[in-house]
Each structure stands twice: as structure tokens, then as C-alpha cells.
Amino acid sequence: EFDKIMKRGVGLACLHYGVEVPKGAPGDHFLKWIGGYFETNWSVNPHWTAEFKVLPNHPVSLGVRPFAINDEWYYHMRFRQNMKGVTPILSAMPGADTLKRRDGAHSNNPHVREAVLKRKEAQHVAWVYQRGKDYEEGRGFGFTGGHNHVNWGSDNVRRLALNAIAWIAKVDVPKGGVRPGEVTVGDLQANQDYSPRGWEPEKIESKLKE
């Protein structure tokens, strides 16, 4: 049923845990819909500070400046063969300390060690996908961050997400990107069931002003 919707050219954005589906038919559909997904025993889910030093010339990155931010950035995603139709938006080089956990479905595996520790391949943690005519030229967006709610306080993160939503909806992204508005500590704390561990409003307020 959902594939029928995708074949009408409807855009699809998947964030954080939303990019993980089982290998097989679900994963194959994600490759058709958004170009990539988190595949167990292939992809990993460490917390680390990713440094995004260069951004591509693409509507989704308009107005987004190079930045660094700590999150549970999944990486070594399973993408379409030869990255056909996939454009990386956020890419960074994970440190060796992200691969110190024992092997497991989400933690570590020989494939990711080969890619990062030996071949030194930068890892794509946000990307866009242009579907073909069989899907009415629909568009997809994948973003592996989003575990740390406080990161929505970052203008760069909000602008990138808003740009992506506009792009997959086939709306022209403004030259400077979609305006992300202003977010306060109070906004970030609103409607949460409880304050996250280590929640320090003054520190967060200071970071938002940087």
C-alpha cells in the first residue's frame, strides 16, 4: 500500500530511528524510496561529534554553514548500488573511538572497520534521493541524527531539515535556505516527559547564542 503512495511521487523524509528497517523486503523498499537505510550488522549507531566541514552545492544545503555537533549519528548506511540517485548532504570522518564496542547488530562489524579504519572513507549521515520515472520523480531524505533533542536548537540542523522538507515536496528552496526561526531553551524543554540527563538550561542558552 505504501509503495503505491510512493509511486505517485510523494516525498518521504526519515529521521534517526526512522531510517532503520529490517534487511530484505523492507530495506529494498527503503532503497527505492529514500536511497538508503540502516542495515543491521552493516551500519553502526555510536554517539560522536561529527564535523561537517564541506557542504554540497544542493538546494538542501542552502544557508547551512559548516558545523560540528554531537549526536547518535548512525553511519555506514546501506545505500543504492553505486549511489545511483543519492546525493550526500552531511558527511564526516568518524574517529576510531566510535568503533571500540564489541561486534553486534548495531555496534560494530568487520565491514564498517574496513571502510573507516582501513580505507578512511568519510561517512554520509544525511542524504537526499531522486527517484526515477517509475516513482514519478519522487524525492527522499534520510537523516541519521536526532537522538539528542537539544540539537534542534541548532539553526543549521533546523534549516537543513526544513530545506529538505521543501525539496522533497518539490517546493523551491529560497536562496538563503528556509528561515529556521528562533528556538529558546523553553521551546526545547516544552512537552518533554522529563528533563534529559545533564539538562543545564544556562549552558544550552549560551550555546544557542553562539
Q: Across the structure, where does each feature detected by a protein language model lie?
A:
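Generic detector of contiguous secondary-structure segments
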Residues: 1, 72, 117-118
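Short alpha-beta junction capping motif
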Residues: 1-24, 143
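Non-transmembrane alpha-helical segments in soluble domains
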Residues: 3, 31, 61, 161-166
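A generic secondary-structure signal for well-formed alpha-helical elements
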Residues: 6, 10, 34, 38, ...
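An acidic, glycine-rich "communication" segment
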Residues: 14-105, 177-210
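Extracellular ligand-binding/catalytic regions of CAZymes and related secreted enzymes
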Residues: 98, 105-210
